[in-house]
């Protein structure tokens, strides 16, 4: 036993004498790395963790805090209802609702699972909705009642606007982090969810947003109507987005002496070149995805011979001149149409405007398509928002019936007739869906 221990000792001693320096350096380095690891490891682990996505987005417009863009509001909260792809109202903060037989009373039952961002449950007393000619009554904590003076079938879709408790305390995936104001206007708003922070900055013009992108003040520009002024730099990426809820249209002033003639408006509608031939095409003011859409209306495909035929016998044709008013983003389209009408024998000029003109002969502009097929405010003869000053007793009656009829099948029939009669006597020509652009820094 003693001999064995001596042998092990001599062997160990010989190994240390031979490799002593290596052993010492190994111990020193190991201790150093262990100590360094205590400081470095947490940083390494933090680096491995997924980082929070962070982006600064430029938008055009002078924005008040109570008039934030609807795209931001929908990220922060939801309404009593939501709108599905077909334009129907579906549950939002309310899980269900009922309507009285006379169509004047709506009772909404709130979803008990809905929580405000401050951690409190959504209750009926939190719901602050003020609509003209509508009475609101809190029945109990989970029930709210609306009483209308007249039946209004689209009412549930009206209640899809995002609701807030106090100052922008909502129920959405994103919540407000910071709001920077300059007087009554908002300079920027910061919102965040569990993994992403978005800062929206507001600028007076698209040129200002492009300058901000060049200077590195923002990472992205959202919802540009035109990209003509965006520099073709490699570090910028442009992404188009077609909006199925917006269209570009040619509006006629139907009280203009020349344009009051139905045949003249039809002729001009036929002689608009380069109408889209794909899914961008729009032939009606009601969305193609709507349950009330009528695909069998007169489409006014480009047909010069038909346009000339319709103008035969029109006495003013040799003396009339037309002026198209439009906004800068639609200038090239307006010039294209003006050239076509001039070739048809009707000299046409183009005027660029900065604001919606109170008077015009022809106006080319964009329009938001309502979720519900109700088009009363746009085409009924009594409405100040009827830009074309259109007056058609048959169309008026259909619009009145459409908003007072609760049965969807009957409403569908009414609005299909409305589209057919409107396009037979066109106060407007619907061209195509509007495309906007987002510009990203790569």
Task: Label the model's feature ranges.
Residues 96-135, 212:
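Aromatic- and charge-enriched surface segment that lines or borders ligand/interaction sites
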Residues 192-193, 202, 236-267, 271, ...:
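A bilobed periplasmic-binding-protein/Venus flytrap-type ligand-binding module shared by bacterial periplasmic
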Residues 349-354, 376-441:
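Extracytoplasmic/peripheral linker and loop segments enriched in polar/acidic and small residues
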Residues 55-101:
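N-terminal lobe/hinge region of extracytoplasmic solute-binding protein
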Residues 27-34, 184, 312-369:
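Ligand/substrate-recognition segments at binding pockets and active sites
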Residues 179-185, 199-255, 366-368:
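Extracellular/periplasmic solute-recognition and catalytic clefts
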Residues 141, 147-200, 204-208:
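Gly/Pro-rich hinge or "lid" segments in bacterial periplasmic/extracellular proteins
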């Amino acid at each position: 036993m003693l001999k064995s221990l001596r042998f092990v000792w001599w062997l160990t001693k010989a190994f240390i004498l031979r490799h002593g320096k290596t052993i010492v350096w190994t111990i020193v380095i190991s201790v150093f790395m262990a100590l360094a690891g205590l400081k470095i490891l947490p940083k390494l682990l933090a680096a491995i963790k997924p980082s929070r996505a962070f982006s600064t987005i430029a938008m055009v417009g002078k924005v008040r805090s109570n008039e934030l863009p609807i795209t931001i509001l929908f990220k922060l909260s939801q309404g009593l209802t939501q709108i599905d792809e077909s334009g129907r109202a579906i549950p939002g903060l309310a899980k269900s609702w009922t309507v009285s037989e006379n169509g004047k009373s709506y009772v909404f039952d709130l979803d008990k699972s809905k929580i405000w961002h401050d951690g409190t449950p959504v209750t009926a007393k939190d719901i602050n909705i003020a609509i003209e000619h509508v009475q609101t009554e809190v029945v109990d904590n989970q029930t709210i009642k609306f009483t209308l003076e007249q039946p209004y079938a689209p009412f549930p879709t009206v209640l899809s606007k995002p609701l807030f408790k106090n100052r922008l305390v909502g129920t959405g995936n994103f919540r407000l982090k910071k709001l920077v104001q300059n007087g009554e206007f908002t300079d920027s708003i910061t919102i965040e969810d569990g993994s992403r922070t978005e800062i929206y900055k507001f600028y007076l013009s698209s040129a200002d947003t492009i300058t901000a992108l060049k200077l590195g003040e923002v990472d992205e520009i959202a919802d540009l109507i035109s990209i003509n002024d965006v520099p073709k730099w490699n570090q910028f990426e442009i992404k188009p987005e077609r909006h199925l809820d917006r269209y570009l249209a040619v509006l006629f002033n139907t009280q203009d002496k020349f344009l009051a003639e139905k045949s003249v408006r039809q002729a001009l509608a036929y002689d608009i070149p380069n109408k889209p031939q794909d899914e961008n095409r729009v032939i009606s003011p009601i969305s193609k995805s709507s349950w009330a859409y009528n695909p069998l209306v007169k489409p006014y495909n480009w047909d010069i011979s038909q346009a000339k035929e319709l103008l035969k016998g029109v006495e003013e044709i040799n003396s009339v001149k037309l002026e198209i008013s439009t906004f800068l983003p639609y200038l090239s389209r307006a010039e294209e149409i003006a050239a076509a009408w001039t070739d048809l024998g009707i000299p046409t000029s183009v005027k660029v405007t900065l604001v919606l003109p109170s008077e015009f002969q022809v106006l080319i502009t964009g329009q938001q398509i309502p979720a519900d097929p109700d088009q009363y405010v746009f085409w009924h003869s009594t409405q100040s928002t009827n830009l074309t000053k259109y007056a058609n007793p048959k169309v008026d009656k259909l619009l009145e019936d459409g908003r007072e009829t609760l049965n969807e099948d009957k409403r569908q029939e009414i609005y299909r007739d409305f589209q057919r009669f409107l396009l037979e006597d066109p106060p407007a020509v619907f061209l195509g869906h509007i495309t906007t652009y987002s510009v990203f820094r790569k």
